[in-house]
């Protein structure tokens, strides 16, 4: 559907709609409500999840192509992240604790696969499970209300994971719909920390796509009230790190530094004695160092950024977190090149490209593309490895084209 066609229906000008969709202006509530009605509001999250998964598997165009700031902003409207009355369908048997555990085991399996192999691997399998087994559970009857809430929470985590995998594979409009659905499922479960977890992913996406104001709104929503207050220390640290990322993107370096300090304190408070959700298994000292390095790099502190990227590389378990390890190495190489040490940068980039072999991820593709462009810009350098590294990056991109 073209902008002109949308403009005829909603009675906003094409230029106004373009501003809304690019994030240059915040869409008013009536525009957001119209987008949701026209392109698929999520009044019943279970039905929405089933429809979304079916459309995803069949690769249908179930949303206007591209990221829409209006859709992500809609989750911040009053009443959006609230449970909605539903009629629960019948089931062959009661859904119990073992069923919840099964969903969580699947979530853990595919989360770890995503960390190693990237979001381009296995998403269809997760969607099939989500829209058959899990939707069946959500439409079932439960042994008690605690089990019901736990099942909705598990389903929300799985929907979030599918969204994260799509985000990682540069399928941003798909990711956005899953994230929005996950917030509604989390609300049905009355799971405030999980809602915050999904909102910080949406903030991350908005920032990466060049919508800093939208990213900051979502990040601030993720650390508001019970979403942050009732989260475990490790999850609070994750929420605060993305909040810092958003503040940095909004050119508020002092506020970003304070948020990073809070994240560091939260992570230090995490311990084996404090229960925490399995979904935060990936967030560690290496993750915090990576985000701190990004903030320092963006603020122009190349020496500080290099030190933090190096710390992240040392602390991360590379085999279990292959994708992020490769990305961190790529970023470190770029900082080293900016510092004028092309020989060291080439060695680091070579390690990054070796690490990302077999990883199907938009983020590793972006790193490889940046490496190729950087080496091309220095093709006349006396550094012997420069052209070899550029060729290696081109080979990765050719082998992992989407």
Regions found by a protein language model. Give the residues of each.
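Short, conserved catalytic or interaction motifs in soluble domains
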Residues: 22
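Short alpha-helical DNA-recognition segment
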Residues: 1-19
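Conserved binding/catalytic microenvironments
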Residues: 90-402
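Residues that mark the N-terminal boundary/hinge immediately upstream of a DNA-recognition element
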Residues: 2, 28-31, 58-59
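DNA major-groove recognition helix of helix-turn-helix/homeodomain DNA-binding modules
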Residues: 28-46
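Compositionally biased, long intrinsically disordered regions
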Residues: 41-99
């Amino acid at each position: 559907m073209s902008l002109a066609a949308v403009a005829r229906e909603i009675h906003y000008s094409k230029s106004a709609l373009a501003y809304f969709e690019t994030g240059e202006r915040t869409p008013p509530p009536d525009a957001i409500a119209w987008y949701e009605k026209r392109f698929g509001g999520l009044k019943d999250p279970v039905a929405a999840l089933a429809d979304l998964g079916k459309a995803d598997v069949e690769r249908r165009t179930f949303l206007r192509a591209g990221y829409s700031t209006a859709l992500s902003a809609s989750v911040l409207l009053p009443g959006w992240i609230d449970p909605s009355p539903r009629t629960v369908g019948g089931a062959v048997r009661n859904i119990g604790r073992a069923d919840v555990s099964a969903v969580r085991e699947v979530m853990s399996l595919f989360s770890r696969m995503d960390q190693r192999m990237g979001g381009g691997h296995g998403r269809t399998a997760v969607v099939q499970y989500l829209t058959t087994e899990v939707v069946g559970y959500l439409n079932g009857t439960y042994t008690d209300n605690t089990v019901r809430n736990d099942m909705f929470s598990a389903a929300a985590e799985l929907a979030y994971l599918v969204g994260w995998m799509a985000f990682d594979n540069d399928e941003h409009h798909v990711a956005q719909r899953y994230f929005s659905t996950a917030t509604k499922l989390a609300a049905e479960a009355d799971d405030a920390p999980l809602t915050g977890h999904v909102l910080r992913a949406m903030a991350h996406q908005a920032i990466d796509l060049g919508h800093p104001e939208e990213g900051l709104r979502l990040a601030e929503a993720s650390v508001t009230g019970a979403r942050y207050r009732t989260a475990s220390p490790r999850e609070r640290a994750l929420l605060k790190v993305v909040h810092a990322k958003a503040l940095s993107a909004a050119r508020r370096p002092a506020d970003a530094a304070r948020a990073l300090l809070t994240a560091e304190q939260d992570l230090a408070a995490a311990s084996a004695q404090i229960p925490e959700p399995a979904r935060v298994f990936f967030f560690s000292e290496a993750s915090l160092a990576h985000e701190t390095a990004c903030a320092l790099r963006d603020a122009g502190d190349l020496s500080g950024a290099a030190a933090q990227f190096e710390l992240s590389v040392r602390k991360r378990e590379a085999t279990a977190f292959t994708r992020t390890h490769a990305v961190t190495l790529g970023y470190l190489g770029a900082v080293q090149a900016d510092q004028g040490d092309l020989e060291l940068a080439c060695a680091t980039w070579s390690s990054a490209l070796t690490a990302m072999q077999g990883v199907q991820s938009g983020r590793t593709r972006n790193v490889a593309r940046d490496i190729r462009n950087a080496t091309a810009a220095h093709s006349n350098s006396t550094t012997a490895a420069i052209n070899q590294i550029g060729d290696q990056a081109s080979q990765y991109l050719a082998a992992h084209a989407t």
